[in-house]
Amino acid sequence: RGADVVIVDTAGRLHTQSNLMDELTKVRRVIAKQLPGAPHETLLSIDATTGQNGLRQAKIFAEAAEVDGVVLTKLDGTAKGGIVLAIADELQIPVKLIGTGEQLEDLRPFDPTDFANALLSEG
């Protein structure tokens, strides 16, 4: 009560568990009922190590929660996160943030040029 920002973390919800996806849809509906126009932003966090399964995961989450942006995490290892290109294209939603570590300062705005260069690099 009286909060300006509410963060709902749905970690652990697998897109293959329809009952959990149904709960997610209900949570969104309840939030919208409590505050007209809410939620104001819904971001899907995708692990950079996720392969082609990430596209299916994103489609199901987008259907359940009306996702309007992607956060690509775990870019601090060898994973390059190329699946995010298919997600952004297929679902027509932008990649908004990238995570390169575990601290707040490791979360930064997505830069398409930097991402393309890193994706195509051999390192």
Predicted segments, located by residue:
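P-loop/Walker A NTP-binding module and the surrounding RecA-like catalytic core of P-loop NTPases
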Residues: 1-123
